[in-house]
C-alpha cells in the first residue's frame, strides 16, 4: 500500500534530521563509519500489492506482467543487473504462462544470483489481523513453489509494507530458517527525531542509538529464537531528499531517483546534470550512513509496481553508478545487489558489530507522521489501530474460510491414503483444495484482510472467498465424508446445504448429519442447526436418543434453531440422525419402528421481558448452569435497557460478582480504514424501542437484547448434557472431555451495524484491579499491554486510539495483586478486533466502524454497511483455571464441527443404512492431550505420498500448572506418556502406515533430520515442529 512520497513529508522543517544525526552520531567515539568508504547495496525491487486500489487480476494483467517481462529481458541481456522479487503468487502465475525456453533462462538467472527471491510467500502478509495458520499456509505455498521449480530456500524476510511488525512474524520466520528480516512501518517517532517539538521526548531513538538494525528475540517462550532485523530508514522507495523551499518556508521540496515517477522531481540523468545529481545521491548516502554502526547501506531502488520500464530505471542508475564509482573522492561505491549480498557483507565485518537486542516486544501501534497532522496538532496523531477491526465481515469470512480449508485439508489427506475398496477420483478435490489454499494466501495480503482496499477490490476478495468456499462445501467435504464413511456402498448423497433438505421434509423423514472434527482432540460440544418449525428427535451415531432443544431466535429474523450436543472422535466423523415426528411425537416411518423411543426436542418458548415501573433495583433475570449464573437488571439510565449486572460463581460459592457489559459508540473525527481517530470519549449506545427475550431449556439458555432493527446482543449459556466421552479407551490418560466443556463459558452474539461516523464497541466493566494492564495475543503468544500516554500526546483521541492493540483471538484483564479471590475476564473471538482497557477494571472490543471521511490514498470513505453476527466467548473467574482452558477453547471456537446432510430414503430401514454406511470414522488411536495440537495434516502435492504434519505445544511458559510443560510424543506409536521404548510402529493413526518421518523447517522446505520410521519428539511450551510423513493405507 503506498505510498505517495509527498504525503510522508518527513520535512526538514519538522525533522531536523541532518543536524541531529551529525551532532549526535558523528561525535560517537564508537562510530565505525568515520573515514570509511560507504558501500551502497542498491536493491532493485518492485512492491506489487495483491490488490489495493485495483484488483489483483487488474494489477497482474496491467502491471505485473509488464514488470516481469521487462525485468527478465533486461537481466538476460545484462549479467550485471540484479533484481529482488517478493510476491510469489504473481510470479507463479506469470511463470506458468511462459515457454519452457524462457523458464530455462529464468532458472539460469536464479542460479547465477541475478534474480533473488525475498520472503518467498504468496504475499507480504498483514501482521495485525492475520492468523498464524494462514501465515504458515501462504508462506508454505510460496516456499514449496520455489523449492520445486528452482531448488531455492528463502532465508530473508521482506515485510516492507505491513502496518506494524508483530513478534509472530519474526517467530515464524525464524522457524522457517530465516537468518535476516527487513521491516519498515513502525511508529515514525521511533525512527526520526522531532526536535522542533520538545514535547516529543525520546523521539528518534533509532537514529540516536543507530539501532535501525537489531537482534530480535521475538518469543517470550523461546529465548534462543532470534532473527537479525533491519528497519528501512526511509521507506522502500528509491532514494530521495527533502529540503526547505527557500521561497515558501511552510513548504518543502523533494528530489529523488524514482525515474518512473514525476520527472520534475526525479529528473533523468544526462551529461548536463550528472554532477548535480551525483552530489544529491552522495549527500543522501552520507546522511543515511550515520544511522548504522558500519559503513554498508541497504538502499531500496524501486517502489509500487516500478520497473515496468526497466530499461529507464537501470539506464539512469547505470550513469550514476559509473560516475560515482569512477571518482573515489566521493567516498561512495555503489553496486546492484540482491538482499543476501548486503547481509553477508554485514555479517562478515571484523571485528563483529555489536547490535541492540529487542526481546519479546512487537512494534505496534504504527503511526504515520503526515505534515498536515503535524502542522495541525504539533504531533503525529495518526494511529493506525483502526484496521484491526475495519470491515469485520471480511475478517470473519476469511477466518471462517480458513477453518473450512482446514476441514478440507484433513479430509483430503485422510481420504487419499484410506483403503475401503472403492475407486475415487481425487483430482477434482485437489483442484478445489488448491484454489482454496491460493485464496487463503491472497487474503493474508496487507491490504486484503485489513479492509484497507477500495470497495470494488474488497468485493472482489469476497467473490474469491465465496468461490473457494463453495467448491470446498459443494465437492470436497461432502464427497470425502461420503468416501470415508462408506462401508458396503459409496455414499454420494451428502450435501453441505442442510436447509434445502430440512425445509422439504415430512413427518417420518430421517436426515443423517455427519459432523467432521478437524481437531485431533475428542470433542463433546453443543451445535445449532437452522430448521423449519417441526417436531423432531435426535439420535446419535449408535442410535441412542439424545436431548435436544428447539429455540426461536428473535435476533436472527425469528428463525428456529435446533440445539443438541455432539460427540466426535479426534480428527474424525460422527453421524447423528434427525427424525421428523408427527404432531403427537410419534415416528411415522414404518421402516424405522425399531428405533428406541425418541426424546422429543424441547420447544423453548422465548418469553418477552417487559420493564415495569414498579420493578425495584433487586428485580433480576437470571440464566445459568451448574457452574455459574448471569444476572441481568433493567438500566433506568439507558432507556430501561436490560443489562448484564453480575455473575454468580457457583463452583466457588461467590455470589453477585460485579460485571456488566454495554455496547458503546464513538463518534468519528476523521477515521478511515487505517487509522482510528475519534472525537472523544464514547457514550452508551441508546436503544430504540428495545425488546428483551428469555429462553430457558435443558441444552441452552438465552437472554436476547434487541436495541433496534439492526443491533442486538444475545447471551447464551450451555448445559453439559453428556456425562462421559464415548471415545475414551482404557489406555487413554488424556481425559480431555472432562477438562474442556461448553458449560465453562458464556457466549455473546453481537449483531451490529454502524451509522455514518459511528464506531461500536463492547465494553465490559468489572471490579478487577488490572492497574491499566491488559493482554492481547498475536495469534500464538499473549502480549502484555499497558495503557499509557505515548510521546506526550494528550489529545483525547490519541489517548484512546494509541492504546488499542490487535486481538487476533484472545484478550483479557486480570487482577494484578494476589488476593483470596483473584479474577480474570477472558474474551475469545473468531476474528481479529482492536481491543483495549481504557479504564481500570474495563475491557473493550471494537466491533464495527463506519466513517464519512475520505481517505487520501484510496479516495473513498470507510462505508461499511454490513450487519454481521460477531460472536465472542467469555470466561470469567479464577485466573489459573481461565488460563488453563482458554487456549483449547479458542482453537475449538475457531474450528467448529462441519456438518454435511443426507436424506435417508423412506424405503431404507435405518438398520440397513448404518450397515451400508459407517456412522463413525476414527482415524487416531487416541485423542491427543490438550496441550498438543495437530496444527497441520496436509497432502501438499497430488502425486506425493507425503503429508506435511505440524504439531504445537499450545501452552506458554507459566500459563498452566498442569499443561505448561514439555511433551514427549512418539509419532510412530502415538504414545505421549514418555514411553520411549516402543519400537513397534503401529502408528498413532488407525488406518495408515507411517513408513518414513523427516523433521523439517516450518514451511517444509529444508530437512532437519535423517529419515526414520519411528520418532520420539519433545515439544517445549509453545514449540512448533514440522514433519514430512510418508503414508500408505493399512490393508
Swiss-Prot record:
Belongs to the glycosyl hydrolase 38 family. One of its GO terms (cellular component) is extracellular region. Residues 1-20 form the signal peptide. Its main location: secreted. Zn(2+) binds at residues 47, 49, 161, 446. It comes from the Eukaryota. One of its GO terms (biological process) is mannose metabolic process. It catalyses: Hydrolysis of terminal, non-reducing alpha-D-mannose residues in alpha-D-mannosides. SUPFAM superfamilies: Families 57/38 glycoside transferase middle domain, Galactose mutarotase-like, Glycoside hydrolase/deacetylase. It comes from Dictyostelium discoideum. The keyword Manganese does not apply. Keywords: Glycoprotein, Glycosidase, Hydrolase, Metal-binding, Secreted, Signal, Zinc. Its cofactor is Zn(2+). The gene is manB. One of its GO terms (molecular function) is carbohydrate binding. Binds 1 zinc ion per subunit. SMART domains: Alpha-mann_mid. Glycans are attached at residues 19, 30, 63, 245, 250, 270, 309, 327, 438, 487, 497, 503, 710, 719, 735, 792, 852, 863, 880, 962, 993. Gene3D superfamilies: 2.60.40.1360, Glycoside hydrolase 38, N terminal domain, Glycoside hydrolase family 38, central domain, Golgi alpha-mannosidase II, Golgi alpha-mannosidase II, domain 4. The active site is at residue 161. Its EC number is 3.2.1.24. This is Alpha-mannosidase B. It is found in: Secreted.
